[in-house]
Amino acid sequence: MNYQGYIIYRERLGKNWSQAGLCKGICTVSYLSKIETGKAEPSEEVLRLLLARLELKCDKEIEQEATELAEQGWEFLFDGRLDQLNDLLKAKDIEHYRATPAWLDLTLLSSKAPLDKAIEACMDTRQLAMQRILQGQENEAVRLTPNAYTYLKLGIAEYKVGHYSSSVDALQTAYDLASREGRIKIMLDAKIFLGNAYGNQQDIPNMERHYQVVKRLAEGLQDQRTLYFIGYNTASSWIEIGRYEEAYKWFSKLEKPTLMSLHKLAICCEKTGRREEALTALNRAETMDADEINHSLALQLLSLVRYRLDYPDYLTHDEYGSLLLECFNRLQRELPSGYAIFHLPWMLEWYKATRQYKKACELMEEFPGKTL
């Protein structure tokens, strides 16, 4: 279906007009019907008159402007330059281009949610691939438009649900395709999530191998945020495998720690016998906002660490078990699997202490890649 035929149809219905009322003096009813159903391409003059009657503005200048804007947007998207894409579109009134075919591109590029399914018949392959990504159907997006960006989105989606093998395959493909085309930001993001995927499986050598590439790329791009991110993830992985002193050195030297980095510092201090320093970190964290995760969940995670510090016999307290289980369930529901994996040792510790061996085994089966 032709998009402009679709928009004429939708706008006519929105005004509760008949076909005869809209096309009077412009064209025949049968011709309008064919235009609306995509069976006929209207002449420029007929299209202009129909749109004008519907109070929709479209001329060659507007259409060219919209097309150029959309193509620049697609280039930014497929290059992974999302900040530049946002800057490009946020200053534009996309509804100004509503009567142009490029409105679909601009709306998809700026949307956080999928468009109405009824409009999919008007979409080309590229647009439909973006629609599928917004719908959470990344596999279908890859089938429609197999490029570095769609493979990256597929890899990230698989990573978030803990499907690490398929995630690694998609992310490696994304990196390879991006490297051929010089899409550095896609290369960077693919390597970040490759490192994350191996880190969540406690495969530290492979995590560090991918993060080393990330480090080189990020330094070249002067991307301090990414350099912090891989440092944070590396130190968090050290906690998971018991390298508490190394993790402590990294978290304790941060000049501007976040709430979650203070949470990790408190755990390092807990594990290395620095109780007072752990409490200081918790006190500071509790006064901060959480940018990384939901604030109420972050406070619950801090409460868990404080409980263990306040009560050395915490494994005999039902209150601790209830708080732990609530936090773990929220982590599984609300966040990528890595957050739950990080807290898995405390869950298993609780189940074993309370002789809930069946639940401990079920949890181990749910996270088979976790080494304890």
Residue spans of the language-model regions?
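A short, Lys/Arg-rich alpha-helix, primarily the initiator
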Residues: 1-14
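Short alpha-helical DNA-recognition segment
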Residues: 15-34
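DNA major-groove recognition helix of helix-turn-helix/homeodomain DNA-binding modules
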Residues: 43-61
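Residue register of alpha-helical TPR repeats
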Residues: 67, 105, 130, 149, ...
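Structural motif corresponding to the intra-repeat A-B loop/turn of tetratricopeptide repeats
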Residues: 79, 161, 201, 221, ...
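Amphipathic alpha-helical segments of tetratricopeptide repeats
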Residues: 90-95, 139-140, 172-183, 212-222, ...
